Amino acid sequence: QTRNFFNVGQARKFMQTTLIAAQIKELLEQNKPSISTRQLYYILKRTIAGLKENTFENQNESDPIIEDVEVSIDALREELGLEPTPKGVFSGLITYKDLRTGDEINCRKMGTAGAAIPANVEPSVMEFKKSEAKFVLVVEKFAVWNVLNQMKFWDKHKCILLTGKGQGERSARRLVSRLNKELKLPVYVFCDFDPYGYYIYSVYKQGSINLAFFSEKSGCPDAKYIGLKHDDVKEFKIPKSNFIRLTEQDLKRLKEIKNYEWFKKKEWQDEIQKAIDFGYKIESDALVSKTIEFMGETYLPKVIKDKDWLD
């Protein structure tokens, strides 16, 4: 979208863009601590002198302009002193250096809590030092990550184990992308057998529809979906007591994602249609009903070894 300085209808947006750009410039030039987009909004919100009008009425006005600035200067907000609120954790065979503090973090020795994924995982802040990992395993749910981490799955199978605790936010997705592209590590994604599990995988792989610019830098196009899959139900004898009937909303969502461009491959069309016909969904947590160790000792090693995945 082009903004014209002489277009009165765009004057407010132009003013807001200038305010945000000036504040970012100050953050960088004065080497101030990074702030959140919410904090940026509060810094810039005020009543304009001589007018009964605020610079910003709510954060819904400032957020899209931040995206515009990112695209305009080809820089992520994390590089501009603006950081998201992370929620993911990871563990495994990697050491990285926090270039702000000089600390080295060994993710092999973070205990049952794991290492928090930093808000800013850009190379200017997070430098990969040592890794013997052979792949990255991304799991949808923290509960699944927690079991695998306690089993030290990452040690036995030489990997980095990561969860975004549901939908991966910016820093989790960007970290996975960096591990894949810079360390040349394959990425395997383990989610629930339901439309939202499929979608979470697609966001790690292709990025978010709403953030195309960020998706170019955070997508992981060769990520593999290793489960749960429809055919796993029979192969691994998942008991019917673990089935949850699909809701009308679930069925609607399955039909929607079946039409997404990145799910057009025959293997995905078949998988989604099988899910619709099956009529049930299954959570990845349900594998513990066989034994608590089943997913870490049997399911995951087998599907990875057999390359039983969807691309």
Description of each model-found segment:
Residues 1-186, 195-311:
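Nucleic-acid enzyme cleavage-core boundary/entry regions
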